[in-house]
C-alpha cells in the first residue's frame, strides 16, 4: 500500500492509496465480488443515502457482507478488512491527518459491496459512519468509462476528483460529501465487467 495523493476537503484530508491488495488478494476479492453479484440489492434495500423527499441518491446494486455471509470471517473481503486496523497502517494514516486517530477507537465495522454498470451513479452524499474507505475492483482491460469519485467541500465546491483505478483505495472521514460519476459501459454484457466498490465503514459503537 502506498499513499499517492492527499486531497484537502474543508479542514481534513482524504488519502488516496494504490495497491491496497497484493495481486493474489485482489484476484480473490474480485472473485468474491462477482460471487456476490446475484445477491446485490436495489438502492431501496441496500442502505442508500436519500434526498429530502426520501428518494435514493444512488443507482447501483449493493449488499453488506453481513447480509450475504452467515459469518463475517467466512468472507475473504471480511477477513482481509481487518488489515486496515493493523498498528502500522493506523499510525501511517494518523501521521497524515490526526482525524484518522479515530480508527484506534473504532470497535465496529462492516463492508458493503456495490456494483456499477451502465448508467449507474451515486449523487453527492455523506456516510453514517466515522471513517469510510472505498476500494475499487474491475476486470482489466477496463470495459467502462466514468465511475470516478468527486470530493465536495461544505460550500459545495469540488475539492478533488479521483480516477477510478483498480486496486486503489480512498479513505476519508465519513462526514465528507462525495459522489460517483455515471458509469458508461463500452459494451453492455452480462459478464460483470463493470465497477465494483468495497465500502468499509468504521464506527465507534455497535454495528448498524
Language-model features, listed with the residues they occupy:
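Catalytic core of Fe(II)/2-oxoglutarate
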Residues: 145-208
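Short, conserved beta-strand element in jelly-roll/cupin
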Residues: 115-116, 126-143, 200-204
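Residue-level detector of short, conserved catalytic/binding motifs and their immediate flanks
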Residues: 13, 111, 131, 168, ...
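Membrane-topology and secretion signals of cell-surface/extracellular proteins
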Residues: 43-47, 56, 100, 132, ...
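A short glycine-rich, His/Asp/Glu-containing loop-to-beta-strand
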Residues: 103-115
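Short histidine-centered beta-strand/loop micro-motifs
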Residues: 122-127, 160-163
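Non-heme Fe(II)/2-oxoglutarate
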Residues: 1-99
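Short beta-strand segments enriched in hydrophobic/aromatic residues
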Residues: 21, 33, 137, 174-176, ...
Amino acid at each position: 500500500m502506498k499513499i499517492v495523493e492527499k486531497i484537502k476537503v474543508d479542514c481534513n484530508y482524504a488519502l488516496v492509496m494504490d495497491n491496497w491488495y497484493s495481486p493474489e488478494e485482489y484476484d480473490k476479492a474480485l472473485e468474491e465480488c462477482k460471487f456476490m453479484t446475484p445477491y446485490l440489492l436495489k438502492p431501496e434495500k441496500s442502505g442508500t443515502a436519500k434526498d429530502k423527499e426520501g428518494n435514493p441518491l444512488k443507482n447501483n446494486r449493493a449488499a453488506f457482507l453481513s447480509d450475504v455471509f452467515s459469518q463475517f470471517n467466512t468472507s475473504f473481503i471480511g477477513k482481509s478488512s481487518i488489515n486496515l486496523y493493523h498498528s502500522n497502517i493506523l499510525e501511517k494514516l494518523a501521521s497524515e491527518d490526526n482525524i484518522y486517530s479515530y480508527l484506534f477507537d473504532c470497535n465496529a465495522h462492516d463492508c458493503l459491496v456495490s456494483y456499477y454498470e451502465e448508467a449507474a451513479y451515486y449523487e453527492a452524499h455523506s456516510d453514517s459512519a466515522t471513517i469510510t474507505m472505498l476500494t475499487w475492483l474491475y476486470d482489466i482491460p477496463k470495459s467502462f468509462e466514468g465511475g470516478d469519485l468527486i470530493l465536495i467541500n461544505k460550500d459545495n465546491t469540488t475539492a478533488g476528483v479521483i480516477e477510478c483505478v483498480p486496486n486503489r483505495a480512498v479513505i476519508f472521514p465519513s462526514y465528507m460529501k462525495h459522489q460517483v460519476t455515471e458509469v458508461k459501459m463500452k459494451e453492455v454484457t452480462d459478464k460483470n465487467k463493470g465497477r465494483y466498490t468495497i465500502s468499509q465503514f468504521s464506527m465507534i459503537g455497535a454495528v448498524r
